[in-house]
Amino acid sequence: MVPDAPVPLERLLVILFTVACLTVVSEVLGTVGLFRVVPLTIALACAGLGLAKIAPAGSAPGQHSIRTEAPPGIGAGSITAQTTKWVAVVAVFVVLGEWLTATVLALHNGVTALDSIWYHLPTAARFAQSGSTWRLHVIDTTSLAVFYPAGSEVIHAVGMEFLGTDALSRGLNVGWLIVGLLAAWCIGSRWGVGPLTLLAAAVVFATPQLVRVDAGQALNDMQVVALVLSAIAIIVTCAPAQGSWLPRGSVAAAGVAAGLAAGTKWPALAPVAALTIGIPFLVRRGDRVRSLVLWFAALLVCGGYWYARNLVHVGSPIPPLRIGIGRIHFTQIHPGLPTFSIVHSLASSGVWRRQFLPGLRLVFGPAWWSVVALSAAGIVAVVAARERRIWIMAFVGAATVIAYLLTEQAFDITQWSATARFAATGIALGLITFAIAVSRLSAKTQLLTLAFFGTTILATQFDAQLWKAWWRVGGLKVFFVALVGTAFMAIAGAVVSASRTTRFGPVRLAPVIVALVVVSVAAGAALDWYQPRFSGSRLPMLAAARKLQKRHVVHSRIALTGTLYAAGSQYYFYDKRLTNYVQFIGAPGAHHTVRLFQNCEAFIGSIAAGRYDYVVAEAAAGPSNPIRWLRSDPAAREIFVDPSGRIGLFEIVGPQRRTGCAG
């Protein structure tokens, strides 16, 4: 599809098409209820053989038709270029150290990020348990999470299906981190500044919020950033020369990456829409129709599944959004929680003082002003550029940030910093654009930019959120991280070695052999240390979960009911091998939504209909008090109720009756 691509881009394309193949095959099988190990294995093997057969043969090293454009006065062997490479290498290992530390901590303590245990992993577990990706999985009473795209959850579910645990989920985002760094390198390599653009991306990837909520967790922000950067990398790299038009095959390849991003989460629609607007300006006039057909086909195949599922089930691709023209409108389902828009508060000095400035510090670390200022400068600096490829990067970055500011977010303005990661793609593109634009001026400006980026990453390491709590686990963690770091160095050496020659003698294979040995030893240490279930978290809901763990409850049906507090803790009640069936229940509403139970009869009837063995109940404000209702039911035996009376755990020991309920 993209013949004669440089080696780094070839590696990136292999990763993208592997993920696309895995995603599409899983979605197709899941639609007919065949998301199982044997059908997956057969289908993936056939798809892999098909891709290998149609893939174009690569060029010999050094014979690629895609040319790079070195910055003026900066040769590959210059002091500036060498300094940039070494600083980039150090930055990569710093960022990997942050992410691997958090990942290893997650192996020890379990996944604890709210969104992970609220809907990411429960959705993935349901895919693996039911074998279906087509059914809507009710998560809570908000009418939001049930309709989210689940591209990342499918990948988690594949790991659960093959391994029987969520161990793969805890390391998946480190893989996306590496993809993001590789894509950033590919973007800059077109202008001969690959290490500098990699460093620019590392500035964002090292920020406290991304590390805290994505590293070792099941959130998908890093996946979206990596996929959008990959689409940009294909677009800016695959034109044969400056001013040349983008080939149709490259448009389709970029569409694959963009489609995967759109199928991962709704905020990715903004950069994907911006790319769609830019595609006609990057291809020949006579090729625009065919290129757009390929682009939209790739988007629909790789990212349209979840929107089609919503459309069939409830009558809208994005149910919370008002979509329509004139009298024709799709179904709109209003979220069951308050929302806010950041743009409405931008003119308030009080909000800036109390929320925005402290939030920026929390999200981006001590050097937040540098991250924001350099990113904004990169988007503005595009005015001086004369290339469409640089314009498209700045346009996508600006569109992502503007869409984030305009979009309605959940809860209220005091929670804005929790969603700032949605703008990470735009911030990263701003920094990358800044690196490219400034480095083309002179060697001095490149060194100055290098100093800014390096100092920003260094300053970020002094943020207490990154290291303070993570080094309390013990020396084994340090040992494990050191082993994994060594493995990464060996793998990096193998990749560099392979990129220089196609001959693999004993010397060339040595780094690969070392990497395999180190990973094997590290895996042994990890298995001895691995704790599958949330040993480090102290959330109140865990008291009920630990009661079930002590009873060794497996292969049981567990119902949860209550507010978002109960819904946000449901993954705690899965066992180590994910055999428990955990379901949030509520009074049925329209369009696959639920609400709090308002009477005892409906609540008890729902438990009986679901044949649940255990019920975890939260007593909400108002008439909804399932704990009192269960206490009045002779078929429910109380196992645990917390001192506040808010959370209760009950075992269903006999047939339930709907009459005579207390309330």
Enumerate the language-model features and the residues they cover:
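Luminal/periplasmic acceptor-recognition loop/helix of membrane-associated glycosyltransferases
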Residues: 572-624, 642-648
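Short periplasmic/luminal acceptor-recognition loop of GT-C membrane glycosyltransferases, typified by
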Residues: 535-542, 546-586, 612-620
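Membrane-interface helix-loop-helix junctions at transmembrane boundaries of multi-pass membrane enzymes
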Residues: 66-84, 189-197, 242-250, 283-294, ...
